[in-house]
Amino acid sequence: MNSWDAGLAGLLVGTIGVSLLSNGLVLLCLLHSADIRRQAPALFTLNLTCGNLLCTVVNMPLTLAGVVAQRQPAGDRLCRLAAFLDTFLAANSMLSMAALSIDRWVAVVFPLSYRAKMRLRDAAFMVAYTWLHALTFPATALALSWLGFHQLYASCTLCSRRPDERLRFAVFTSAFHALSFLLSFIVLCFTYLKVLKVARFHCKRIDVITMQTLVLLVDIHPSVRERCLEEQKRRRQRATKKISTFIGTFLVCFAPYVITRLVELFSTAPIDSHWGVLSKCLAYSKAASDPFVYSLLRHQYRRSCKELLNRIFNRRSIHSVGLTGDSHSQNILPVSE
């Protein structure tokens, strides 16, 4: 194993560790907070988190073993199962992000009718459709024997070893990426650009009110005026940064892998195996970044994390006080005798 392989193996180990911790923390927050569970987006987040954990436990370790051993890391049946999960979880992850963007679009653009438009029943229906959509492709690939170990990505994933099926496999793979990656990307762009438009409109209204107030307050201190103007500038940039993060992480993580798969199908030029594994690692890194992008940085999840930490530390302090009290009583008893 050369330095490239060692670096890729280290990247996979780090991704597995971060993904387990962050997604596990999101799951604990969902179990702990009834307020979060009552909201429709909790179903999308739960679906995304469980998929990320399953990918972290099954697919990432097999890819790590494939990178280290430079060969198929498991038997044919286990590899086909892992390839089925890899295809299903990739599509499910992308479509779940699209569902979350639709939820935020409805919440921002139609705030008064949001509760009527996005109930838990509606969210459950969207999750069910996501599963059905995502299951279609791996089930088809399983029926056509297009699941197995792919040496270029050191992973159990979509692959076809028969030259006479090259065209059919290329059409199938293109349809899979078009109806998962491209469809989700279009939905993300449409919904978040609508959200950005509404956010900028509200910022303009607030800016007008702020400027009118500053004009009326003649005796206001210059430092207060500067703080108001700085807050106005931050308000304009906040929505743009968030939306850029949502769309940017989606592209950075998934686009290299999707483009590599398509180039592999329609080009005769050889692709370096290290790049293939790196593109797969980038796709896996989405599982590690999703909890921070969609959950843990939000106020409700931060509050739930604080409550969990306080509960843990309070139990420890009570336990330590109890032990101290017991030892103190044991020291006193012999004296009283």
UniProtKB/Swiss-Prot annotation:
Disulfide bonds join C79-C156. Detected in extracts of several brain regions including striatum, pons, cerebellum and cortex. Not detected in numerous peripheral tissue extracts, except in testis. In the brain, detected in cortical structures including the anterior cingulate area, posterior cingulate and the frontoparietal, somatosensory and piriform cortices. Prominent also in the olfactory tubercle, the islands of Calleja, ventromedial and posterior nuclei of the hypothalamus, the medial septal nucleus, nucleus of the diagonal band and the ventral tegmental area. It is found in: Cell membrane. It holds the Pfam family 7tm_1. The chain crosses the membrane at residues 11-31, 48-68, 82-102, 124-144, 169-189, 246-266, 277-297. The keyword Membrane applies. GO terms for biological process: adenylate cyclase-activating G protein-coupled receptor signaling pathway. Residues 1-10, 69-81, 145-168, 267-276 are extracellular. Keywords: Cell membrane, Disulfide bond, G-protein coupled receptor, Membrane, Receptor, Transducer, Transmembrane, Transmembrane helix. One of its GO terms (cellular component) is plasma membrane. It is a multi-pass membrane protein. Signal peptide: none annotated. The keyword Transmembrane helix applies. Residues 32-47, 103-123, 190-245, 298-337 are cytoplasmic. GO terms for molecular function: G protein-coupled receptor activity. Belongs to the G-protein coupled receptor 1 family. PANTHER family: G-PROTEIN COUPLED RECEPTOR (PTHR24245), G-PROTEIN COUPLED RECEPTOR 26 (PTHR24245:SF6). Orphan receptor. Displays a significant level of constitutive activity. Its effect is mediated by G(s)-alpha protein that stimulate adenylate cyclase, resulting in an elevation of intracellular cAMP. This is G-protein coupled receptor 26. It comes from Rattus norvegicus (Rat).
